[in-house]
Amino acid sequence: MKKLIALLLALVMVVGLVACGAKEEAAPAPEAAPEAAPEAAPEAAPEAAPEAEAEAETLYIPVMAKGFQHQFWQAVAAGSQAAADEYGVEIYFDGPASETEIAAQVNMIEQEMAKNPKALALAALDTSAVADILDECAEKGIPVIGFDSGVPGDTSGAVKATACTNNENAAAIAAEKFGENADLVAKMQAATADAPVRIAVLSQDAVSASVCGRTTGFVNKMVEVASAYGTVSVEGHDKWANKVDGATIIIEVAVSATTEAVDVQNSANALLAKADLAAVFCSNEGTVTGFLSAVSDGEDLADGGKYEDLVVAGFDAGAAQKNAVRQGWFYGSVTQDPYQIGYQAVALAVAAANGETVSDVDTGAQWYNAENIDDEMISLLVYD
């Protein structure tokens, strides 16, 4: 009996040892857990990214100009395309053959609206003619960016900003350059109340925003510059006149009766008849043309000419003005920057299409003279 009990106890001990051994061998099993990790996160999700990219549309932005035939608009188009390339958007630049073809421009814009653009850049020939289109843009949430003359008088709320020249700032450049002319400065320093010096601005009207802005910009800056050399009086047109008795420097604003070339020339002749005239700023291409007619197409300004000592500056460009600058008959001229007008118009349109808040951009202006007129950047800006 004792032997039987001993045998049973031995069997129990063996079974216990076997069970303990099995548990000890199973302990490392958790180390296998990391092997399951790759199964926990399928790799299929990232494959959706290319599909999302395929769904993303390239922004389409029509750029509708007031014209297309002049070099000015070609420079605007070049700037527009440069911005489109930089921002990765598609544009279509177009304009009517003439800046009098309002109906043609409206038709062009309507065709582009049918393509559901994400934004529209517009230099309107007639704001009232595109009123319905502007209302449609406002209703559909298509932001409109004005450029050059923009979309003046818009009431739809569709126009979010404008890329254009600040005419006051641009014309002020001419006044600053007059202040750098040694001969003119010497005349201002030597002037007296009995023998004043006269600096004139010749404008074709006192109504249009661009011409008025340039006239104001020149007068204000010229007063600032001239005040360093004497007492200044602004005379001529009532809109700008601020007459001061005993002035040594007179800034005269001459506005022609009409914008016709003959009337501008008559105003130029009236200025040229004043013996104390020392300098003239012509505020646009039209007044430059009229003034040049009064000085034998510029030859009277040449060395040995009747008005060889007269300091003259213009605005914009054109073949006749460029020739006067290149010959040195003009001290220089101010040109707008049509390349930047186009570039900034598209840049603003892209930002507005992406829901960003935008505001007006001054596209700047450049001074050109006989020394830099053929520089690569200036030559792009000064059209014929």
Where in the sequence are the language-model features?
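Positively charged n-region of N-terminal signal peptides that target proteins for export
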Residues: 1-9
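A residue-level marker of the well-folded mature domains of exported/periplasmic proteins
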Residues: 20-384
